[in-house]
Curated annotation (Swiss-Prot):
NAD(+) binds at residues 92-123. Its EC number is 5.1.3.6. In roots, leaves, siliques, flowers, pollen and stems. Homodimer. Its main location: Golgi. Belongs to the NAD(P)-dependent epimerase/dehydratase family. It comes from Arabidopsis thaliana (Mouse-ear cress). Coiled coil: none annotated. This is UDP-glucuronate 4-epimerase 3. Gene3D superfamilies: NAD(P)-binding Rossmann-like Domain. It catalyses: UDP-alpha-D-glucuronate = UDP-alpha-D-galacturonate. InterPro entries: Epimerase_deHydtase (IPR001509), NAD(P)-bd_dom_sf (IPR036291). It is found in: Golgi apparatus, Golgi stack membrane. It is a multi-pass membrane protein.
Amino acid sequence: MKQMSHLDDIPSTPGKFKPYFHRTRWQSSVAKLAFWSLVFVGLIFIFFYRSPVSSNPADPSRRSLRTYSWGGPAWEKRVRSSARLRTRRGFSVLVTGAAGFVGTHVSAALKRRGDGVLGLDNFNDYYDPSLKRARQALLERSGVFVVEGDINDAALLKKLFEVVPFTHVMHLAAQAGVRYAMENPSSYVHSNIAGFVNLLEVCKSANPQPAIVWASSSSVYGLNTKVPFSEKDRTDQPASLYAATKKAGEEIAHTYNHIYGLSLTGLRFFTVYGPWGRPDMAYFFFTRDILKGKAISIFEGVNHGTVARDFTYIDDIVKGCLGALDTAEKSTGSGGKKRGAAQLRVFNLGNTSPVPVTDLVTILERLLKVKAKRNIMKLPRNGDVQFTHANISSAQRELGYKPTTDLQTGLKKFARWYLGYYNGGKKAAS
């Protein structure tokens, strides 16, 4: 007797059922309904219940959207005060991810030059939340109020735009990290795609619509082998989920620009480093492990090829961000209706000087006066690429972008900050 396969349920001739196919159309509809219901429930589970939970419920850095506290006269007063301009021609800027590495530096720079700045950050625990709190305290002393909330909270975003008619948004909030995407993929979709769409939805309905500058990533170049990387190069071969979400962000930006007249500028950052940096970046955890006497893993490419990065110092990145804000044209819509064509741009922000990771380690050894224990390993197939190299001609021409800090100088500044922050300045970098 012939064994029945799941393929045998399909009619060999359209409209003609096989003898053993007895399910009614009603039963089939119920089955389909049940299937899609399960899919829907599964998606809800992934995006709302799979996000990391704290082992300490009282830890404010791990709060969910439902527990953020905002609103009220006192809160609104702080929001207005922080966003108030100090110069006649200044901007009123909402900075998302303000307690992050780049967000902190950009917020401080904007405030120093007289712009009104309001920060927004959810203080998640992707890396040590206490570092984010320290950055927050730094900004508070500069007069920047950082609202604790999430970009997926539409009600909060709408309230912020009701209180302050922002002229610009600097969108730096994102789930960062290439390798972490293999452990928690849903967080990348939640922050980098859903969060971005939520922000754009609020911005397109605002009156006036703000001009938006946002952080894309050099990772969008993925498996591209042409160097240096140009904005005109292909970006359809992402090597990681993180890269894929950033590429998706660029396509989403194009859509909102085309339909709603939002002015959007994407910035592809190349390996940003410096004081107050991210602990998940190689230069940061290399420094930590070298000082502790732990071995560090240094990757090499195929056939012992060199792994190199276009390391870009934070002050240079900040100049590029401010240049993008200063040259951003106004959005052309209002209340969700497009009035005309709007500006849409994307720029590389790099240093144009790729440096082998082995050279970075050598510089750190000299600055820290400690010999590193090197463990050479093959580059894992988890999203990392062998090299990055930025072509910055477009940013130079249109933003006046000109990086001035070499890796030796930048790492010296980072090492001094690191030793002061973590070691009380016991070992000074020289």
